Curated annotation (Swiss-Prot):
Gene3D superfamilies: DsbB-like. Residues 1-11, 64-70, 165-173 are cytoplasmic. This is Disulfide bond formation protein B. Residues 29-46, 89-145 are periplasmic. One of its GO terms (molecular function) is protein-disulfide reductase activity. Required for disulfide bond formation in some periplasmic proteins. Acts by oxidizing the DsbA protein.
């Protein structure tokens, strides 16, 4: 069956399942494989969680209004683009030589206790902590590279569900 012809609800719930699966795998790697997430990884997880919630709400609400569907598609697309930016920054940090970037030094829990939310966000994006380490690879790509791939795929799915033309029944058959 062609996934491009699935209903709005089925496509949104598929997006939700992908986000849930990606988050479940990240938690599995943390709890059972011992891979501790860096602050940029945590921000990517938050972006996947927000994407999943948006897909779930869109799928459960299943509006027949064209403008509501476009709004959902646009929100999903923008959230995925933000996630792509965070993952892109993480990939950039990993590809830079380790001695050229300063370390942010503190874990995210400490930063959130001592700074405001915008300062934490700025500090995490400008520093590296352990974000430059590549501890996991699959098919030659690191975790942030795979995250970037999935963010782009989910952004395209958001555009598809929000802006695909509905088949219209002929007026006279």
């Amino acid at each position: 069956m062609n996934a491009l012809q699935w209903s709005f609800r089925a496509q949104c719930l598929t997006g939700f399942l992908f986000c849930t699966g990606l988050l479940a795998y990240a938690i599995f790697l943390q709890l059972h494989q011992g891979l501790e997430p860096c602050p940029l990884c945590i921000f990517q997880r938050i972006a996947f969680a927000v994407l999943g919630i948006l897909f779930l709400i869109a799928g459960l609400y299943n509006s027949s209004n064209v403008y509501t569907r476009k709004a959902y598609g646009l929100l999903i697309f923008l959230t995925a683009i933000i996630g792509t930016g965070i993952a892109g920054r993480h990939v950039w940090v990993q590809l830079m030589p380790h001695n050229t970037i300063s370390s942010c030094g503190s874990p995210l829990s400490f930063l959130s206790e001592t700074m405001g939310p915008f300062e934490v966000f700025r500090t995490v994006l400008t520093g590296t902590s352990n974000c430059g380490n590549i501890d996991w690879r699959f098919l030659g790509l690191s975790m942030p590279m795979w995250s970037m791939f999935w963010f782009v795929a989910l952004a395209l799915l958001g555009l598809l569900v929000g802006f695909k033309a509905e088949r219209r029944k002929p007026l006279f058959s």
